[in-house]
Amino acid sequence: MISVGIIGASGYTGGELLRLLENHREVEVVSATSRQYSGVPVSRVHPHLQDTDLKFEDVGAGEIDADLVFTATPHGASMKIVPQLIERGIRVVDLSGDYRFDDTETYEEWYGIKHESPLEAVYGLPEIHREEIASADLVANPGCFPTGAILACLPLVYEKIADTFIIDSKTGVSGAGVKPTALTHYPHCSDNVIPYNVTGHRHTPEIRQELSRLNPVRLSFTPHLVPVTRGILTTAHTFLLEDLEQGEIADIFMGFYDGEPFVRVVEGIPGLSAVRGSNFCQIGCFEVDDNQRAVIVSAIDNLVKGASGQAIQNMNIMFGFREVEGLDFPGMYP
């Protein structure tokens, strides 16, 4: 049994961490922080969590006593918190973008923030970095879009049969966070599909960085906001470097992800409702046209495999628990 703290527990990702950890047999949540809701029972902010006696606390990184802390804080805030935790010997899974990049220059260019406290971190996509995650003190949890996009493209890059991708992702409104904006205001996003940051989304270099660890790639990425609460459906287009048929591509994906506990290669086209609420990524389609354009589709829940579930998966690996502990349940179809 380990003790866990959550810094920034009042948002959607913090709430998902609390929900998922309620049934984790190896974890006790000892601290859930929130400046806004200090002293307020967790169940008032997260009404589905009625079985917890936790109250939000307004405590700093120097006051939390835990074996591991999840930092579910905005970009730019984590870099001010994480070094204090690491210095005290507390292992960290950071859900912000502050530690995802190999160099601070890329972070500063795409996030527009000067990085004040660079640290060595392991990028927390278990399907690539499982061994490094196991011994890491700091794991940088991947972004939601990169998780779905990387998993959709990875086998083709590994096999050197594709090196250029056009990636289109449709995301639910919860990906924008708990604070409403003009973009996510109901009258604007309902009955609408909204492309945004069409050529300059900050998850683009994150996707490129991780795929290029295997082989150099070129890619374009465009996200769209759609009027659903949860989920990311990613469609990756690529022109194959070899002549392959649909069945051959499916075989490559099935072989590559064989044994992966949370990646499911499926027949047909994945759907958001099949993975909603779960830590699974479904990958399918694998269609090829007469120009050797291959189309791969992946589906994840942006709050689970795209955030909090993957963070717990990383924690499980770090502490030698069963990787599926607390996460081994299906989605909530329909």
Swiss-Prot record:
Keywords: Amino-acid biosynthesis, Arginine biosynthesis, Cytoplasm, NADP, Oxidoreductase
EC category name: oxidoreductase
One Pfam family matching this protein: Semialdhyde_dhC_1
Gene3D superfamilies, alphabetized: Dihydrodipicolinate Reductase, domain 2 (3.30.360.10), NAD(P)-binding Rossmann-like Domain (3.40.50.720)
Major location category of this protein: cytoplasm
GO CC, any one term: cytoplasm
GO biological process, one term: L-arginine biosynthetic process
Catalytic activity: N-acetyl-L-glutamate 5-semialdehyde + phosphate + NADP(+) = N-acetyl-L-glutamyl 5-phosphate + NADPH + H(+)
Molecular function terms, GO-annotated: N-acetyl-gamma-glutamyl-phosphate reductase activity; NAD binding; NADP+ binding
Annotated localization: Cytoplasm
InterPro entries: AGPR_AS (IPR023013), AGPR_type-1 (IPR000706), NAD(P)-bd_dom_sf (IPR036291), NAGSA_dehydrogenase (IPR050085), Semialdehyde_DH_NAD-bd (IPR000534)
Enzyme Commission number: 1.2.1.38
Pathway terms, separated by semicolons: Amino-acid biosynthesis; L-arginine biosynthesis; N(2)-acetyl-L-ornithine from L-glutamate: step 3/4
Active site, UniProt feature: 144
Function: Catalyzes the NADPH-dependent reduction of N-acetyl-5-glutamyl phosphate to yield N-acetyl-L-glutamate 5-semialdehyde.
HAMAP family: ArgC_type1
Entry's family note: Belongs to the NAGSA dehydrogenase family. Type 1 subfamily.
Name assigned to this protein: N-acetyl-gamma-glutamyl-phosphate reductase
